[in-house]
């Protein structure tokens, strides 16, 4: 396990991003985080912009997916690496499901700082997702303020798949 007094040992790190986005990590047992921590990873997480718990203005990401939430996750990663030099920044991973999976896709398409990623139950392309989900087509209008008939360009600009060639 992690021993803060041992400054010589390094650990791989995992940024884990919750679903939602209107959800939140709380100080409770979260199976995936515990499994990775038990395997020797330094697991860290945040409740980025778009999360519940700080009011509607903070939680409303409408039309901004993959922008300020991404910046927030990268700022938290920077701060964690600064506070815990035992984390090997060359052995970073990112993971998440649903919205966390979308953000995992977004992260790996927009930065090369993570060596591994596990995207679960995620959106990678807002256009193809629009009519192939149990959530319904209206989710796109609510979340990114676009649909394939009125503004497919905006949908594509918010799609992690667009940035997959990084």
Where are these regions (language model features)?
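Short beta-strand-to-loop junctions in surface cap/lid or active-site-entrance loops
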Residues: 1-9, 159-164
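Short beta-strand element of the alpha/beta-hydrolase
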Residues: 8-20
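Short, Asp-centered acidic motifs that coordinate Mg2+ and/or phosphate
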Residues: 12-13, 42, 116
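Short glycine-rich, flexible loops that bind phosphorylated cofactors or substrates
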Residues: 23-24, 126
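Short N-terminal helix/helix-N-cap motif within the alpha/beta-hydrolase-1
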Residues: 24-27, 53
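Short amphipathic alpha-helix adjacent to the substrate-entry channel of hydrolases
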Residues: 27-46
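Active-site-proximal cap/loop segments of hydrolase catalytic domains
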Residues: 45-166
């Amino acid at each position: 396990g992690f021993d803060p007094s041992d400054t010589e040992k390094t650990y791989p790190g995992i940024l884990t991003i919750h679903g939602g986005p209107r959800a939140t990590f709380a100080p409770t047992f979260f199976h995936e985080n515990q499994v990775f921590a038990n395997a020797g990873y330094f697991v860290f997480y945040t409740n980025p912009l778009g999360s519940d718990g700080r009011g509607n203005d903070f939680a409303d990401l409408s039309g901004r997916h993959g922008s300020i939430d991404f910046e927030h996750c990268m700022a938290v990663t920077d701060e964690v690496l600064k506070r815990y030099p035992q984390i090997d920044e060359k052995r970073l991973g990112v993971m998440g499901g649903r919205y966390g999976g979308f953000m995992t896709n977004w992260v790996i398409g927009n930065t090369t700082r993570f060596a591994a990623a596990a995207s679960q139950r995620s959106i990678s392309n807002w256009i193809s997702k629009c009519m192939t989900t149990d959530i319904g087509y209206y989710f796109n209008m609510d979340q990114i303020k676009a649909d394939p008939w009125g503004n497919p360009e905006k949908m594509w600009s918010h799609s992690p798949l667009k940035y997959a060639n990084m």
